[in-house]
Amino acid sequence: VHLNAPLQPGESKVVKRALVIGGGIAGIQTALDIADAGYEVDIVEKTPSIGGRMSQLDKTFPTLDCSACILTPKMVEASAHERINLFTYSEVEKVSGFVGDFKVDIRKKARSVDMSKCTGCGVCSQKCPSKKTPSEFNRGLGTRSAIYTPFAQAIPNVPVIDREHCIKFQTGKCGLCSKVCAAGAIDYTQEDEIVTREYGAIVVATGFDMIKLDKFGEYSYDTCPDVITS
């Protein structure tokens, strides 16, 4: 085997940009490490904000340190880093190529809010008449508006319209958020956009999801409303 050699030695292009799939604490720290090493990084996060599951925690085990005190400075650092690009409310659509030269299609889902105009004042969420949607951030223990930011420290601090629960998209009526938006950032005509980028490396940091306790009958999770998870 040691005598084997390629018939024609060749070189392959290496794109000096990395893709991190997942904007939780693992993805954020990975992006910061790569960016601090001098390389451009894109973070693709499927929810409207980076932060991931750690943003939902009160304290961390075993030291019981404040979760937000650890996470939010890193969120701010990642968003302000000159070599990190955030693709929030986006998903990887297609990956082709090979190590050193990947081509990736990223679907930027329509927020129905112009990020370049929005000031993050929150008036649209306050005035929205549709407020009965279970909050994903609070694991269904509370409700949110049809136009919302996931949590107070969200980055970017730009709301997204949940079209399935928006009166405007379902009936053609309402439009109150557009009327109260002083910045004129509401855009009901916004559509998904496909962005194609090239990368030399891809890091998958997609995190975890909560176990479905309704599969464990001994806890009566699906029959007793007073049984909740931690």
Where do the protein language model's features map onto the residues?
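A short, basic/flexible loop-to-alpha-helix module at the beginning of a structural domain
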Residues: 1-18
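Non-heme iron-sulfur electron-transfer modules
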Residues: 6-9, 47-73, 87-117, 129-165, ...
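A conserved hydrophobic secondary-structure block that centers on an alpha-helix together
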Residues: 13, 29-32, 189-192
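N-terminal Rossmann-like FAD-binding beta1-loop-alpha1 element of flavoenzymes
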Residues: 18-42
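Glycine-rich Rossmann-fold phosphate-binding loop(s) that bind the pyrophosphate
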Residues: 22-26, 121, 206
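Conserved beta-strand segments of alpha/beta enzyme cores
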Residues: 40, 83-85, 226
